[in-house]
């Protein structure tokens, strides 16, 4: 139960206010009204209480719908905001985030933890004595480790009246250290509000007096609107700089928020918000119209879908949304709301569907290139936009399938991963066995250190070289330098592979899963990396053009990916 006595005992245990002072403080704290509210809504907890408080006070959080879309649906996130009014700032941002996701907490003044129905949402810090308990620091750590949202008011105290107007006090840098630890994106929020003249006058008299007025300031905003602006998220790779101190990064974040307030471009490069998910029932209905190729070993359904001029295509929108989520998670992505391009209309989409959760597990975009050549010519083939083709590529184009834009959405990572995708490809090849080649661009994240990219390109050029120069990148990756090539002996594949893993490990990296998978599916000579090039339209990743000759497919891989579906087709 919220009471003045509890607050005083916790924050000012030495205080002995006179009866008349206590009576005044109870009024300033709206103790009676809080207790009546708590009695009336004792069944509510957490975010439900936040919504009810705002409804009770008739305060409307005026947040544009587009701004709400800036809040990512999953993954660790640090929201940084100015702190103009006090308690209401935290409630407004909790309410905003709850429209999108429920795993949110706010770092706030210890006094507010006495609002018991809301206490589960608060991580308390002691702004009065400038201390933060170890337990609170652990809570912050756990919140981001679990992939949740953490709201910070880096000023630590409510904004003050200055010569330049109402401004936050100097920001603390604690949020930078936590966000860096979990590589969390930052999301700036600007609350356009101010307190009363009485409040700002109190800040000139005492540091403690403004705290006593915070509840009064919240209640005075009854029957009003609280405008909130949420900016685009700043990916970790865009805000973090190992050469800068936490204090310097904090200053840049404050500058970025100030630019948001003014409606100007911020200090950091931002990303568009990822689009909201499509209706599950619509997706299920669309997939039931598609060709079913079979099932994976654990029951995921494999569908083959093509747009075929369909005007409204929720499946394609969802594929584009999930692609962008998966690619951003590994430092790639288009930076757009959905990763969709002009090739998606013509191409086939191999989709893995989880019937139980009504989720697209992952997908491959692909096209038998002979069909597309007859229909659109070379310009209709995606990889041709990245690589020039030699005439000797004709055999591959006539008897091959171009693969690309493969993804597994992050919630399914670590289960069967790429095995799902290869099972899907195998299901298609079991039904259409006359194709000999698989080929397409395979990316190395632009987020990897340059040294790691150089090592990967050098290794795959050395051990999976093109027998003929069938293609050449339009933006060639530089030739491997002698000192990079010298890292590998070139005589024993396994020794060099172990060396590559060790060198990448020293850089905090690993072999990209698709590169690992392609290098393992065939007998020697069955896989080639024809050329490598840079892709500025895809977050500056490196594209390697891989070519797989299916006649070299290892027997165990054939049985696992293709043979299993042949048996299923016969039994069907």
Model-based region annotation:
Residues 1-80, 88-92, 99-101, 119-120:
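Membrane-anchoring hydrophobic helices of lipid-metabolizing enzymes
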Residues 334-337, 370-526, 530-533, 541:
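Acyl-donor binding region in acyl/amide transferases
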Residues 271-309:
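Conserved N-terminal entry element of GNAT/NAT acetyltransferase domains
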Residues 342-351, 525-528, 538-543:
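A short helix-loop-beta-strand connector motif used in the catalytic cores of GNAT acetyltransferases and
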Residues 117-121, 127-161, 165-182, 187-193, ...:
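Glycine- and acidic-residue-rich phosphate-binding/metal-coordinating active-site segment common to enzymes
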Residues 294-349, 353, 361-362:
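Short amphipathic alpha-helix that is part of the acyltransferase structural core
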Residues 2-4, 103, 134-275, 485-491, ...:
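Non-catalytic C-terminal accessory region of glycerolipid acyltransferases
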Residues 358-363, 401:
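Glycine-rich phosphate/pyrophosphate-binding loop shared by adenosine-nucleotide-utilizing enzymes
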């Amino acid at each position: 139960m919220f009471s003045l006595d509890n607050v005083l005992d916790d924050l000012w245990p030495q205080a002995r206010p006179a009866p008349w002072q206590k009576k005044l403080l109870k009024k300033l704290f709206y103790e009676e009204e809080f207790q009546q509210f708590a009695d009336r809504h004792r069944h509510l907890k957490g975010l439900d209480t936040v919504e009810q408080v705002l409804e009770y006070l008739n305060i409307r959080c005026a947040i544009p719908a587009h701004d709400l879309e800036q809040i990512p649906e999953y993954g660790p996130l640090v929201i940084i905001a100015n702190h103009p009014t006090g308690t209401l700032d935290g409630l407004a941002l909790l309410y905003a985030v709850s429209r999108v996701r429920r795993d949110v907490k706010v770092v706030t003044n210890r006094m507010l933890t006495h609002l018991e129905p809301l206490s589960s949402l608060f991580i308390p810090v002691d702004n009065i004595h400038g201390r933060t308990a170890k337990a609170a620091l652990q809570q912050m750590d756990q919140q981001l480790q679990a992939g949740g949202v953490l709201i910070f008011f880096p000023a630590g105290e409510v904004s003050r009246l200055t010569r330049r107007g109402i401004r936050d006090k100097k920001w603390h840098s604690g949020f930078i250290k936590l966000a860096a630890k979990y590589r969390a994106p930052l999301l700036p929020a600007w609350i356009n509000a101010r307190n009363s003249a009485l409040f700002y006058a109190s800040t000139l008299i005492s540091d403690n007096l403004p705290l006593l007025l915070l509840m009064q300031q919240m209640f005075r905003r009854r029957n009003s609107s609280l405008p909130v602006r949420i900016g685009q998220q700043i990916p970790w790779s865009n805000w973090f700089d190992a050469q800068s101190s936490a204090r310097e990064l904090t200053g840049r974040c404050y500058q970025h928020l100030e630019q948001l307030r003014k409606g100007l471009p911020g200090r950091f490069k931002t990303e568009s918000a990822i689009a909201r998910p499509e209706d599950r029932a619509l997706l299920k209905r669309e997939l039931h119209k598609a060709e079913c190729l079979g099932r994976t070993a654990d029951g995921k359904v494999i569908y083959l879908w093509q747009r075929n001029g369909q005007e409204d295509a929720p499946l394609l929108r969802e594929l584009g949304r999930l692609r962008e989520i998966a690619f951003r998670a590994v430092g790639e992505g288009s930076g757009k709301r959905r990763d969709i391009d002009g090739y998606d209309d013509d191409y086939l989409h191999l989709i893995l569907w989880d019937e139980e959760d009504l989720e697209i597990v992952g997908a491959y975009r692909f096209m038998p290139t002979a069909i597309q050549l007859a229909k659109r010519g070379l310009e209709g083939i995606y990889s041709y936009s990245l690589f020039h083709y030699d005439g000797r590529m004709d055999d591959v184009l006539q008897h091959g399938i171009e693969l690309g834009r493969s993804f597994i959405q992050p919630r399914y990572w670590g289960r069967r991963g790429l095995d799902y995708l290869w099972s899907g490809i195998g299901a298609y090849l079991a039904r259409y066995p006359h194709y000999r080649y698989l080929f397409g661009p395979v990316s190395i994240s632009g987020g990897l250190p340059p040294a790691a990219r150089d090592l990967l390109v050098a290794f795959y050029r050395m051990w999976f070289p093109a027998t003929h120069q069938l293609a050449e990148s339009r933006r060639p990756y530089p030739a491997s330098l002698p000192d990079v090539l010298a890292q590998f002996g070139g005589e024993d594949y396994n020794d060099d592979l172990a060396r590559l893993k060790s060198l990448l490990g020293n850089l905090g990296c690993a072999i990209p899963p698709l590169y690992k998978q392609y290098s393992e599916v065939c007998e020697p000579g069955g896989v080639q990396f024809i050329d490598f090039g840079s892709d500025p339209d895809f977050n500056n990743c490196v594209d390697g053009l891989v070519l797989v000759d299916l006649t070299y497919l290892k027997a165990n891989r054939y049985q696992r990916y293709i043979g299993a579906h042949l048996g299923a087709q016969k039994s069907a």
